[in-house]
Swiss-Prot record:
Residues annotated as domain SCD: 293-378
Entry-linked PROSITE patterns: SCD
Region (Disordered): 1-75, 1064-1083
Protein name: Cohesin subunit SA-2
Matches recorded under SUPFAM superfamilies: ARM repeat
Keywords: Acetylation, Cell cycle, Cell division, Centromere, Chromosome, Chromosome partition, Disease variant, Holoprosencephaly, Meiosis, Mitosis, Nucleus, Phosphoprotein
Encoding gene per record: STAG2
Organism: Homo sapiens (Human)
Listed PANTHER family: COHESIN SUBUNIT SA-2 (PTHR11199:SF3), STROMAL ANTIGEN (PTHR11199)
GO cellular component, one term: fibrillar center
Subcellular localization: Nucleus; Chromosome; Chromosome, Centromere
Clinical note on disease: Mullegama-Klein-Martinez syndrome: An X-linked neurodevelopmental disorder with variable features including intellectual deficiency, microcephaly, microtia, hearing loss, developmental delay, dysmorphic features, language delay, congenital heart defect, and clinodactyly of the 5th finger. Holoprosencephaly 13, X-linked: An X-linked form of holoprosencephaly, a structural anomaly of the brain in which the developing forebrain fails to correctly separate into right and left hemispheres. Holoprosencephaly is genetically heterogeneous and associated with several distinct facies and phenotypic variability. HPE13 features range from full alobar holoprosencephaly with cyclopia to semilobar holoprosencephaly or septooptic dysplasia. Dysmorphic features include microcephaly, hypotelorism, low-set ears, micrognathia, and cleft lip/palate.
Length: 1231
């Protein structure tokens, strides 16, 4: 047992215990450590008689007898036979009654009452020991704490403050409440008796220095709460002294005849008593601050550090005259560099309480100037909670004084409105709003009642637009709006103002919006309307849609009504004004999907609906841009809702538009495809533009009645025959035909269909697949990519999955690609996805655009690869085609590593053995490619061969730790690998190694994944291919065989998992080595092996002969899983595990103490935490801030009364940079 550190020898606060937990030499005068101690280092000893041996009380200290006393607690309020700990633990009794009972006990016999209180703190620490009256009288603090340490339960690291469960849920709050109430009830007498507080403070100081975390944590919390209660007492004393001083001054200023001398004497006496009491409180607070806080605020346990910082924040806020100065603020400033987020969070919340009170700002100026940069950098903290509070703190700093934060500081916060983490973004949005939008000029007061362009929000909307454009993140308007939604709702919902800024002419002297600003305003307006209508954050921010409250639903309905009433009238005007601007029109056309369409009828707005439909028709005729046309299509889809009466009106308009487009397309196509005539560019443009419009509408609308398959088929077939069809026409014809197929399938699936419908769709689908296959060999890359993407979609949709969900009637539509099509798809991937990035065009002018194009190209290639991998995962194509994909894993890891890895995982879930065979096939392909390039006499140390080995190692890692689950797959992998290695005999004879023998070097990377018995089985199988001469060879060329054999013969020591690992997550629990396994246990192991009940008819294909006792089923042609462990894993006892038969050698390593998690050990080394900067991005990283700090050990001195000018013992200002931190440590000036 590690002894507790030495504690002061009695209940005297004179000495500061020298901690074994942290070297707090920063706070001590090393050279004059034992010299005379100044004021504040002591609390006076209680006055005791000669017969009282240092403990005071009723002489012998015997507990009183009587019915009203039990365990030092009165039997009142229904609480009987309970100690203080039990009462606080229950948390049901009124705490004041509990404390009053203890005070009565203390007045009767203070030693016995204090003994109860001491045992209360011991029990609250989770210690089962009890301090007896004899120990209390005769033993010193250090001896008592050492004795209690020995009574601790070492098997568990839990104690009341950390225990889980409902009974402990409120323990901490009850514990803290008890201490606060105790001091409050004792504040007028008992705390000044120079005994009770001396005893408690000395005990808590000693416990807080213990190496037992439970003692340290509990006593630190108690001491800090005790200090907080004393600060409150000191504050009350200060108020009383001020009142007494005012009364005294008023009485003394009276005329001599009216002056009451007796009252003056009483007031002087009262002031003197209050002064003495204040001095006593100062001594107590000094003792706690120096004995506990200055040591524990740097404790190794984050919870303890957090307690200290939280409480010092309360002291500074509660009694700012005494504590809000740089001598105490420095502790918070230093701790902002703490390595644990919860401690940094406490620092920020403590500072928020101070900055919130504007009256305290003058006292924070020096602190702000020193630590402002740190606070700004914490907005990028890796802990999001810390970042949020840092931004909120800066918002308070901004409100207190705008001059403190520079433009650069503000910009560091501004960009966080685009953060994907919503709480961070919302906090940054509030900061932005306070900085740029909350101020209003006096001249704007007269504009409050105005609306629209002349309203008070007009300038603010412009400011928002300017900010959005300057941020240069034009694709993230939704994020900006969401960030400011909570704090600037009124501004963001002023759609009337936004609309007037777009439609109305600027006033005289007002600068009009530029084209770029109008585009930005329209985008922001769209995002605000979407946010109001949908009531959830944009994609990528938040956890998805939540259930709206009744109030939120009402607000949503009101907003949609307001949006519809305004924009049903304004939208046609906006479309007319910006009809030629594709970007603006695209955004404006999205508004109707957020309308309440019923208002068109109830509000008699049909004429505005007609105007909207006319504008959409005009836009379709004017534009050929795909985004604009799709926006028009979606708008028609939103308006064509059969639930509303406007459906007929919109449907007629849509049908008329499609009729005209279809007729025009057929007419143009007939002219375009006339034989013998060369189509000119104008004809091609007309065909393309019309086809674009039809394709865009076919995306959202069923146009089956216009029979678009025939004309598109004719167009595509002509393109194949002639080979001169413009690429854009082919691309859109393929896409349009794809939509035709999908709409027909949807119609067949949703309603009963005839056999003729199925056969017609089957024929069209097969013909279309053949056309797409033809276009895979087109000379144009864009056409090939479109054909490949559509072909993958068609194969996926019409695979065997189409019959799932009870749709067996669709079986005739199932289409399985033949080997030639699979081969062409794979060739396309190899030729167009696994290619090197073109780095030629890197001019300075076009570098940024070039980077953007590269990213876009990579994104396109990733989509192509994902489409093909989906075919592999859903077994639409053969799994072995994945070998050509898997072998690219290392080479293209940065670009496609995640896709390939996920494909491996999914294929392994489908078929472990086939996946393993595919992996080994990919390695064999790479090996063969290396042989073709370098010949059989290649260098095994070459980068190419090393790369293949590294790929094998990566493949091995993907099998995970559960060897039992992958047992068969790994065995089959070794089988295929061995056969490949010996497949090509050396033409020079058996004295030379087989041509592929070096492949065994690659195969050895998988040996660690074999179970012990399977290693023996694989070794036996390997020997079937070896001759006697091979086993004797030791030349370098035979090294792969030797290393592979050794990896199989390594046996148990190389095994990292036992068979039982697949059954129990507990793993091996062997604590001691066993000499020899019992026979019974050996039988269990043999029973765990996968046995064979059938033999292969061909002996050549068998791994083992019948005489061999170890069997690995995957090495047979017909594997059968007959093992008990595979069927009923729970029947195995832990003592019968594989590990108990083959005990692993245990290596003892010295494990460093991990402060990031609470362990279960009783004793701890009290290392000082490394204070580190944990920012994502920070400058001027401070290394080990605590090291070399020269802490001052100032006394707590309460400020003099504002009217007590005669007091001369005023303390100097302790804020001395030299006493705070040695500047040589940081290399920068502290302030």
């Amino acid at each position: 047992m590690i002894a507790a550190p030495e504690i002061p020898t009695d209940f005297n606060l004179l000495q500061e215990s020298e901690t074994h937990f942290s070297s707090d030499t920063d706070f001590e005068d090393i050279e004059g450590k034992n010299q005379k101690q100044g004021k504040g280092k002591t609390c006076k000893k209680g006055k005791k008689g000669p017969a009282e041996k240092g403990k005071g009380g009723n002489g012998g200290g015997k507990p009183p007898s009587g019915p009203n006393r039990m365990n030092g607690h009165h039997q009142q309020n229904g609480v009987e036979n309970m100690m203080l700990f039990e009462v606080v633990k229950m948390g049901k009794s009124a705490m004041q009654s509990v404390v009053d009972d203890w005070i009565e006990s203390y007045k009767h016999d203070r030693d016995i009452a204090l003994l109860d209180l001491i045992n209360f703190f011991i029990q609250c620490s989770g210690c089962k020991g009890v301090v007896t009256a004899e120990m209390f009288r005769h033993m010193q603090n250090s001896e008592i704490i050492r004795k209690m340490t020995e009574e601790f339960d070492e098997d568990s690291g839990d104690y009341p403050l950390t225990m889980a469960g409902p009974q402990w849920k409120k323990f901490k709050s009850s514990f803290c409440e008890f201490i606060g109430v105790l001091v409050r009830q004792c504040q007028y007498s008992i705390i000044y008796d120079e005994y009770m507080m001396d005893t408690v403070i000395s005990l808590l100081t000693g416990l807080s220095d213990s190496q037992v975390r439970a003692f340290r944590h509990t006593s630190t919390l108690a001491a800090m709460k005790l200090m907080t209660a004393l600060v409150n007492v000191a504050l009350n004393l200060s108020i009383n002294m001020d009142n007494t001083q005012r009364q005294y001054e008023a009485e003394r200023n009276k005329m001599i005849g009216k002056r009451a001398n007796e009252r003056l004497e009483l007031l002087l006496q009262k002031r003197k008593e209050l002064q003495e009491n204040q001095d006593e409180i100062e001594n107590m607070m000094n003792a706690i601050f120096k004995g506990v806080f200055v040591h524990r605020y740097r404790d190794a346990i984050a919870e303890i550090r957090a307690i200290c910082i939280e409480e010092i924040g309360i002291w500074m806020k509660m009694y700012s005259d005494a504590f809000l100065n740089d001598s105490y603020l420095k502790y918070v400033g230093w701790t902002m560099h703490d390595k644990q987020g919860e401690v940094r969070l406490k620092c920020l919340t403590a500072l928020q309480g101070l900055y919130y009170n504007k009256e305290l700002n003058s006292k924070l100026e020096l602190f702000t100037s020193r630590f402002k940069d740190r606070i700004v950098s914490m907005t990028l903290d890796k802990e999001y909670d810390v970042a949020v509070q840092a931004i909120k703190l800066l918002t308070l700093v901004l409100q207190s004084s705008e001059e403190v934060l520079t433009a650069e500081d503000c910009e560091n916060v501004y960009h966080l409105v685009y953060s994907a983490h919503r709480p961070v973004a919302v906090a940054a949005g509030e900061f932005l709003y306070k900085k740029l939008f909350s101020r209003r000029d006096p001249e704007e007061d007269g504009m409050m009642k105005r609306r629209g362009r002349q309203g008070p929000n007009a300038n603010l909307v412009k400011t928002l637009v300017f900010f959005f454009l300057e941020s240069e993140l034009h694709e993230h308007a939704a994020y900006l709006v969401d960030s400011m939604w909570d704090c600037a709702t009124e501004l963001l919902k002023d759609w009337e103002c936004m609309n007037s800024l777009l439609l109305e002419e600027p006033l005289s002297g007002e600068e009009a919006l530029t084209d770029r600003q109008e585009s930005a305003l329209i985008e922001i307006m769209l995002c605000t309307i979407r946010q109001a209508a949908e009531c959830h954050p944009p994609v990528g921010r938040g956890t998805g849609k939540r259930v709206l409250t009744a109030k939120e639903k009402k607000t949503q309905l009101d907003d949609r009504t307001k949006i519809t009433e305004l924009f049903a009238v304004a939208l046609p005007q906006l479309l007319a004004k910006y009809s030629v601007d594709a970007e603006k029109v695209t955004n404006l056309l999205q508004l109707p999907q957020y309308f309440d369409l019923e208002i068109y009828t109830t509000g008699r707005l049909e004429k505005h609906l007609d105007a909207l439909l006319r504008q959409i028709r005009n836009i379709v005729e004017k534009h050929t841009d795909t985004d604009v046309l799709e926006a028009c299509s979606k708008t028609y889809h939103a308006l064509c809702n059969e639930e509303f009466t406007i459906f007929n009106r919109v449907d007629i308009s849509r049908s008329q538009l499609i009729d005209e487009l279809a007729d025009k397309f057929n007419r143009l196509l007939e002219d375009f495809l006339q034989e013998g005539e060369e189509p000119d560019e104008d004809d091609a443009y007309q065909v393309l533009s019309t086809l674009k419009r039809i394709t865009a509408f076919h995306n959202a609308h069923d146009l089956s009645k216009w029979d678009l398959f025939a004309c598109n088929y004719k167009l595509l077939k002509t393109g194949i025959e002639n080979g001169d069809m413009p690429e854009q026409i082919v691309i859109h014809a393929l896409q349009c035909t794809h939509y035709v197929i999908l709409w027909q399938l949807a119609k067949i699936t949703e309603s009963s269909s005839t056999k003729e419908d199925l056969l017609r769709l089957k024929k069209q689908m097969r013909v279309f697949c053949q056309i797409c296959q033809h276009y895979l060999t087109n000379v144009n890359t864009t056409v090939k990519e479109q054909a490949f993407t559509i072909l993958c979609d068609i194969l996926m949709i019409f695979s065997h999955q189409i019959m799932s969900g009870g749709r067996d009637m669709l079986e005739p539509l199932v289409y399985t690609p033949d080997s030639s099509l699979q081969s062409e798809l794979l060739s396309f991937i190899l030729d167009h996805v696994f290619i090197e990035q073109d780095d030629d065009n890197n001019s300075a002018d076009g570098q940024q655009e070039d980077e953007a194009s590269k990213i876009e190209a990579l994104h396109k290639r990733r989509n192509l690869l994902a489409a093909f991998c989906k075919l592999i995962v859903y077994t639409v194509v053969e799994m072995n085609t994945a070998a050509d994909i898997f072998k690219q894993y290392m080479k293209y890891y940065n670009d496609y590593g995640d896709i390939i890895k996920e494909t491996m995982s999914k294929t392994r879930q489908i078929d472990k053995i086939q996946c393993a065979k595919t992996l080994i096939l990919s390695l064999q392909q790479l090996f063969n490619e290396m042989i073709q390039e370098n010949g059989y006499n290649f260098d095994r140390s070459s980068s190419t061969f090393s790369g293949i080995k590294e790929l094998a190692r990566r493949f091995a890692l993907t099998f995970g730790l559960d060897q039992l689950k992958t047992r068969e797959a790994i065995a089959m992998l070794h089988k295929d690998g061995i056969e490949f290695a010996f497949k090509e005999p050396n033409p020079q004879g058996e004295s030379h190694p087989p041509l592929n023998l070096a492949f065994l070097d690659i195969l050895s990377e998988f040996s660690s994944k074999l179970l012990r018995q399977d290693k023996r089985t694989v070794y036996v199988y390997l020997e079937k291919f070896m001759t006697f001469q091979m086993s004797l060879r030791r030349e370098d060329v035979w090294l792969p065989l030797m290393s592979y054999r050794n990896s199989l013969l390594a046996g148990g020591d190389d095994d990292t998992m036992s068979v039982i690992s697949g059954i129990s997550s507990r793993g091996s629990t062997v604590r001691s080595k066993k000499s020899k396994p019992s026979t019974g246990k050996r039988k269990v192991v043999e029973g765990m092996q996968l046995s064979l009940t059938e033999e292969s008819s061909s002996s050549d294909s068998m791994w083992l002969s019948r005489e061999q006792t170890l069997h690995t089923p995957v090495m047979m042609q017909t594997p059968q899983l007959t093992s008990t462990i595979m069927r009923e894993p729970k029947r195995l006892r832990p003592e019968d595990s594989f590990m108990s038969v083959y005990p692993m050698q245990t290596e003892h390593h010295q494990t460093p103490l991990d402060y990031n998690r609470r362990g279960t050990s009783l004793m701890e080394d009290d290392e000082e935490p490394i204070v580190e900067d944990v920012m994502m991005s920070s400058e001027g990283r401070i290394e080990d801030l605590n090291e070399g700090m020269d802490f001052d050990t100032m006394d707590i001195d309460l400020p003099p009364s504002k009217n007590r000018r005669e007091r001369t013992e005023l303390k100097p200002d302790f804020f001395d940079p030299a006493s705070i931190m040695d500047e040589s440590v940081l290399g920068v000036s502290m302030f």
